[in-house]
Amino acid sequence: MENGKMNSLIAQYPLVKDLVALKETTWFNPGTTSLAEGLPYVGLTEQDVQDAHARLSRFAPYLAKAFPETAATGGIIESELVAIPAMQKRLEKEYQQPISGQLLLKKDSHLPISGSIKARGGIYEVLAHAEKLALEAGLLTLDADYSKLLSPEFKQFFSQYSIAVGSTGNLGLSIGIMSARIGFKVTVHMSADARAWKKAKLRSHGVTVVEYEQDYGVAVEEGRKAAQSDPNCFFIDDENSRTLFLGYSVAGQRLKAQFAQQGRIVDADNPLFVYLPCGVGGGPGGVAFGLKLAFGDHVHCFFAEPTHSPCMLLGVHTGLHDQISVQDIGIDNLTAADGLAVGRASGFVGRAMERLLDGFYTLSDQTMYDMLGWLAQEEGIRLEPSALAGMAGPQRVCASVSYQQMHGFNAEQLHNATHLVWATGGGMVPEEEMNQYLAKGR
């Protein structure tokens, strides 16, 4: 972006200056509305989410057999919700900032099959596509036992079709493993920052991995191009997919059930704050949408991004969405948080969700490494760097009197609050890689 344009952007949005300087930044969204007011802009409804629930239930018998690690939950891919009181104390001590309320962790990092939040959206979209093809071919009815999809006849049928996706890692892992298991031919277009072990794991499942020297945006574009030339190839579009988004949104109802099970209350007097790491936006956007449908105006969602890849904060704050990239303002999009290394946000998610998000913040790679180490020490939970992005949120909210006033929170409400950090990945990181992460924390 030339200097003149850049100066006028900064004049209009002074916060951009802090982003360019790679400062850890927090922006509380003044444009937040009620769910009733914001929902129509999403273009999806409660019914769409219920359809996704129903589809995952239909596939549960299949998943329980195809992936024995899901048998205990009857083929439902869901993660634990745990309190992390020792980490809460450690954060308070390290940052000299009390966190009022209780700190919880949602362990999507340990979801079965692919060990990340992408096991929600990625797997769901592959299943939805497989179902559509099998229904159209007359091989399946909605009331059938879907475990029959494991038969050689179905494998043979699906092998005529292929799937392509562009990814920095975790989405590729989910889609690759699931597609290969169903019988699709699958190609994952990986950006430069994808971890070697993720590529190796995909190849071990018979997935074709195409590597690029450039970033996420290029990998997605190349994947899209490759798929266009083949009528039997389905491209899963992380930047625009409503199906992926709905796969993530199912988490809202599921979390509500977990809260009920644990006797946790969410209402006007007991607000819920949720902190979601954000790359292109599909995962956190879908989850936040589901949470809003489940908890209404009593849940407050925040997106967390690396200082080197603040694409969603930049897009929503300036109102330019996918018309601007972090590279346009001179930021390099290089971060250890490989799952969040995205320079241009999803225009669909930004526009759909901007009224339903309370805020956005950035944090440095070093902050992620530090918190990764503390969590391992205090709670014995090991995550990958990007999964710690949400962990910086509670301090930011508890420290901001202006945010608390904007929403009219009193001391008692904050005392009764639940702070939920969404851990997005790390459950399958190899030991030696994890030790390298741990060595970088302070």
UniProtKB/Swiss-Prot annotation:
GO BP of this protein: D-serine catabolic process; isoleucine biosynthetic process
Reactions listed under catalytic activity: D-serine = pyruvate + NH4(+)
PROSITE patterns in UniProt: DEHYDRATASE_SER_THR
Domain of life: Bacteria
An example Gene Ontology molecular-function term: pyridoxal phosphate binding
EC number: 4.3.1.18
Required cofactor names: pyridoxal 5'-phosphate
Subunit-level organization: Monomer.
Family: Belongs to the serine/threonine dehydratase family. DsdA subfamily.
Name by which UniProt lists this protein: D-serine dehydratase
Origin species: Shigella dysenteriae serotype 1 (strain Sd197)
Gene responsible for this protein: dsdA
